[in-house]
Amino acid sequence: MSEIKKIATRDSYGNTLVELGKEHDNLVVLDADLAGATKTGVFKKEFPERHIDCGIAEGNMAGIAAGLATCGKVPFMSSFAMFAAGRAFEQVRNSIGYPHLNVKIGATHAGISVGEDGATHQCNEDIALMRTIPGMVVINPCDDVEAKAAVRAAYEYEGPVYLRFGRLAVPVINDEVTYKFEIGKGIVLKEGKDVTIIATGLCVNEALEAAKLLAADGIDAKVINIHTIKPLDEDLVVASAQKTGKVVTVEEHSVIGGLGSAVCDALSEKAPTKVMKIGVYDRFGESGPGAELIKKYELDGESIYKKVKGFMA
């Protein structure tokens, strides 16, 4: 049996920027002294004249990206999620979001899977922050195939986009030949009648693993991949909730303000349903290997399985 291919989505980001750079002269990449870590260094090597290192000044980087957008460029500003969404929030909101400029934010090292860098660098709040900015699209791809498609879709989209990428290498679960990406459209990975599991990012694969374990116990779980958290695919969420009667959300992010909150917002208005949110529960991260932290914070397939089984009791 062949080993499952694993790739970090930050690598997908950097490699796709190079591909797009060859196709489009107006693409410009900005970084904040982290080109090696965000993987935009490969773009810098290929197109040094279109790569701008802004130094450790993320707010300034957002302002520069905004200015470039007004000149017809398509800037991708890149940094760790903690800095792109956290430190630069004011400038992203006021300089990019308010005028609705065509800036793309490539945020790497999101969530607890950042690992050894610890709590100060593990951003579990970025989705919540970016969701609040009017007109901001928020995308959290689950694997290499989806990440590459998301970067391309972000380039084609006219307006601000926040792209969330990870440091940890994760299984490639999508087929590059058949996969289709559309902003705002969720993907049903497995049909089911007893409960709907809605996942995003690296938790999508874990949700699929949990569904296999649930099936062995006679629980038929529907699994949905929500790569676009804003705008949310409300039609799919509502229809699935009405079909199964119970919903579980899974995310490598705080349960406050992320995917779970977005799903609850939609269902409370259109189809009140019992929902269990699985994620980071009102706490900070800690230092340790990314894969081990996923297990400790109970975001792995077996932990999800146990929680869903308890929810169904």
Where are these regions (language model features)?
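Thiamine diphosphate
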Residues: 1-164, 169, ...
